[in-house]
């Protein structure tokens, strides 16, 4: 049993290493392995925009395998999916030097859910539609978006859609204090 267990650990590491470099965060200074998920992120935003602008679709379900989820997790900065390996031929990914594990990033039936809430009508102060708010669930657990994103209030997991479009863009800009809801705009 001991030798078989060691073999299983070695094979698990080999599969994780392959996925890490091909679909995960990979090595420092590159993003090709996960920017391939950008069209999926763009579709999340497009679906929200379509609904907010009068579309009748109330939910969008997308189904995919780990080969899609791993890059999407790295792109979103989900827990355990962001630590890159050094850009080196000698300092490579190992379990000892990196938290990334395929079984954690994409367990069986891994899922990402965005809930969107928006008040109908227009903000009387701006004359524009109220800003949609978004929260994310990762494997059924409500979590914050990546650290570059500013929630509507300290400790909240709700974000303005405009903030997410900025902070999840490739340059990770944030609206800063404008991402917060003010006391007189809590219904926005």
Q: Language-model segments: what does each one mean?
A:
Residues 1-188:
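Non-catalytic terminal regions with compositionally biased, polar/charged low complexity
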């Amino acid at each position: 049993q001991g030798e078989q267990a060691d073999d299983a650990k070695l094979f698990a590491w080999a599969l994780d290493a392959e996925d890490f470099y091909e679909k995960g965060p990979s090595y420092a200074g590159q993003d090709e392995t996960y920017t391939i998920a950008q069209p999926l992120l763009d579709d999340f935003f497009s679906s929200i925009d379509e609904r907010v602008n009068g579309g009748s679709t109330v939910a969008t379900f997308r189904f995919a395998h780990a080969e899609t989820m791993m890059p999407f997790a790295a792109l979103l900065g989900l827990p355990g999916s962001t630590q890159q390996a050094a850009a080196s031929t000698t300092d490579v990914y190992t379990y000892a030097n990196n938290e990334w594990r395929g079984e954690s990033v994409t367990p069986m039936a891994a899922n990402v859910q965005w809930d969107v809430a928006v008040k109908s009508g227009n903000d009387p102060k701006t004359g524009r539609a109220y800003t949609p708010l978004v929260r994310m669930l990762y494997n059924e657990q409500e979590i914050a978006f990546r650290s570059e994103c500013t929630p509507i209030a300290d400790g909240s997991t709700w974000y303005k859609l405009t903030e997410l479009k900025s902070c999840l863009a490739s340059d990770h800009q944030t609206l800063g204090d404008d991402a917060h809801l003010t006391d007189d705009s809590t219904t926005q």
